[in-house]
């Protein structure tokens, strides 16, 4: 019912895609309604990939730029759906956290399916407890992240998230090199740098 969707669902049309307000950034994600602090702006399922697959992809691939990773882990996480369209800002208006669908799945299963599962209803703790090989071989995107508003967002505002301090430092070095005489002669190499999840997001079994 509509009431169930309002209680348990998240509308894809709450956001929309258009040209970013950052010059040269390409597309960005924008609010299609007002959001209060703490509201979920959008959700991305997450695919788990081995780092060596990401880093040994074809030469002109920038897949690495769209993945989260930790220095001490061989696991890279690729958000699908709207996640890769959210640009970086040192002053973000959303923050990332793990999202747990199991309460919604269980509530809908109890109401409409006699308590039988309507889908993959592993609890968040179970998913985060999966080992790397389990995540790689899963037949579905086993993890989800939510982008939550950190303060009020108005309809039409661009959505920004922090890619982390390591990403910002790498970007600053890259843009500084691109302005040098030597760099202008040799050509502009492609920028590649993992994004970072908030500190403590990777469970110990992934590291």
Give residue ranges: language-model regions:
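Conserved catalytic SET/PR domain of SAM-dependent protein methyltransferases, capturing the structural core
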Residues: 1-207
């Amino acid at each position: 019912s509509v009431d169930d969707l309002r209680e348990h669902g998240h509308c894809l049309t709450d956001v929309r895609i258009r040209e970013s307000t950052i010059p040269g950034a390409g597309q960005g994600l924008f609010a299609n309604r007002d959001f209060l602090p703490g509201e979920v702006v959008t959700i991305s399922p997450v695919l788990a990939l081995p780092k060596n697959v990401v880093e040994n992809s074809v030469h002109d691939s920038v897949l690495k730029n769209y993945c989260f990773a930790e220095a001490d882990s061989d696991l890279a996480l690729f958000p699908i759906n709207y996640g890769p369209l959210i640009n970086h800002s040192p002053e973000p208006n959303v923050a990332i956290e793990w999202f747990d669908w199991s309460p919604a799945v269980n509530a809908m299963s109890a109401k409409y399916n006699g308590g039988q599962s309507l889908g993959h209803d592993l609890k968040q703790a179970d998913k985060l407890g999966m080992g790397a090989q389990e995540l790689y071989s899963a037949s579905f995107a086993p993890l989800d992240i939510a982008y939550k508003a950190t303060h009020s967002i108005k309809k039409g505002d661009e959505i920004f998230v922090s890619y982390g301090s390591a990403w910002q430092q790498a970007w600053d070095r890259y843009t500084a090199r691109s302005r040098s005489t030597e760099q202008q002669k040799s050509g502009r190499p492609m920028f590649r740098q993992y994004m970072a999840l908030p500190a403590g997001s990777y469970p110990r079994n992934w590291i």
